[in-house]
């Protein structure tokens, strides 16, 4: 994917006209795939050019009738980059601008949840409530998709598509993720939900676990040695994109964002502040209600932070998706400690996971995707 700085460096300073900057911004914003508004273009240019950004983008678009075309009369008017505009941009920049479907993202964030309630319900509420979302997608597909927009702190409008897998577990999560990626081509896929935490490190209900890596702890070989059946683990761990990891590390202690989120919760909450943990999280198709089983897993992963049932399927599906590959991240909040399970903290954990994930994207999107 070509970023805005590439367009800037492709021509001499005197050739960076308003027309060139606006057409370049439209290409980076994927206006050749889905239309954008003058406001979106203006905010993008102000973010990258500051006071040197074009003053009246709306008037400029109306003047570039050979290069751009209104696709929706609005309000606001939606604009697309035409074939003529692409050719003009190619001739000005000297860049080969491929516009095939396989070379373009079509949405920003894809969200996968294992459960409609409480996990997806918390996500819908974190993005303005159910009325802020609209259903979309082909009814021939098994999954129901909802679309909404969130406004990042930078002023960028992000297209968000959410879905739930048809059941809990790695296979269902991998299928849901694959279908979402192929249909909506998001830049980033986020698994949001609840998990069981390990007792080490003073974790408490509502703490956020970000899997880095996610480990399929049931992957391996069962052998019989000296009459004793033994499991020999042989997992293929999948970690975070380095940039995503670096940005998340800023939230690795009692960050003030957790106090802000806690203030929006009206119900029982832990006494100590919540925080984020970044490290290994195990995944497998089994519900664990036995603390000794967690200890067995920790023999192989001493820094294990928790266990759950979906993230590895999401990470693996993204890892093996077509180019351009999205990035993947998982936000799972602690709802129990894999023993004496109870539903009493699930709503709070789902709330914390959803609210933190959306707040993180709002605050850090330009850090995750500097060109957007």
Regions found by a protein language model. Name each.
Residues 1-25, 32:
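Short alpha-helical segments that sit at the start of domains
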Residues 32-45:
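Short acidic, hydrophobic short linear motifs in intrinsically disordered regions
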Residues 33, 49, 76-77:
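Helix-turn-helix/winged-helix DNA-binding modules
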Residues 49-63:
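Short amphipathic alpha-helical interaction segments
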Residues 62-75:
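A short, conserved structural fragment
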Residues 72-93:
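Accessory beta->alpha helical hairpin/"wing" motif in late/C-terminal subdomains of nucleic-acid enzymes
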Residues 94-371:
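Intrinsic-disorder/coil detector with helix-boundary
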